[in-house]
Amino acid sequence: MAAKAEISWKRTDDAGEKVQVYAHHVGDRWLFYWRYRRYDQWQALEFPPFEDWMELLDAVRRRVQRRLLRPEEIGRIEKRIRELFPEADITTDERG
């Protein structure tokens, strides 16, 4: 049985509007999409903000603990975050 390759969450944008975001795992990369309302079309999010990457990392860590994703995926996402946001602090104490 294959693991679900989509992870979604909600956040607010800079203008205070609620936004739905989902990340889709394709090969070795994650593609991000967003929309404002349930029946709006999903639009590709070409440059996801740091907060979205951290939401994805948190969700992947939880899925790894439940054996829904492979542990290597955490390292791949952390590496990608460091490439995109070199000044960012990524704490890994949750792996414990």
Where would I find each of the regions flagged by the language model?
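Short, charged/polar N-terminal "headpieces" of proteins
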Residues: 1-25
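Mixed-charge, Lys/Arg-enriched low-complexity segments
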Residues: 35-96
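Short beta-strand segments and strand-loop junctions that repeat across beta-rich extracellular domains
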Residues: 22-41
